[in-house]
């Protein structure tokens, strides 16, 4: 089934999904200084679209589930990859992320986002939505394929995100 995704996304085909292997606009640099974080806060505050967030951890490599990278995407502001090892307090971003948050499996990421000082005012969980509409597979890649007709490269989700510097291929994955 052909899907017109709009918003600059390629047209998808749920029978033959298009593989998305590179982020639109390239891979952004990692934000690891307070000055860069404040610039991201200004950019996010200037936006008005919903905000997609994700967190990368080092589960299976480190004890606990601390966040090591927070990804934020706002269509009209850009993509931000934030090193929470270098910047453990992201509360300066809160005024710029007061719109609807888009998360997948929010129960995994909300505790980490709270840990770095971010709290949603409203959220939409794509995993819960997938379950509610009766999809049989509800992982992020499966939902993107079934609903948007787009395939996601999910090759580094189980990596040790505590490693520094983060490899370029991991950053590409994180920016998708």
Descriptions of predicted regions:
Residues 1-6, 10-51, 55:
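N-terminal accessory regions of nucleic-acid-interacting proteins
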Residues 20-30, 71-176:
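Active-site-proximal helix-loop-helix substrate-binding element of RNase H-like nuclease domains
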Residues 26, 34, 38-46, 55-80, ...:
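A cross-family signal for N-terminal binding/gating loops and helix N-caps
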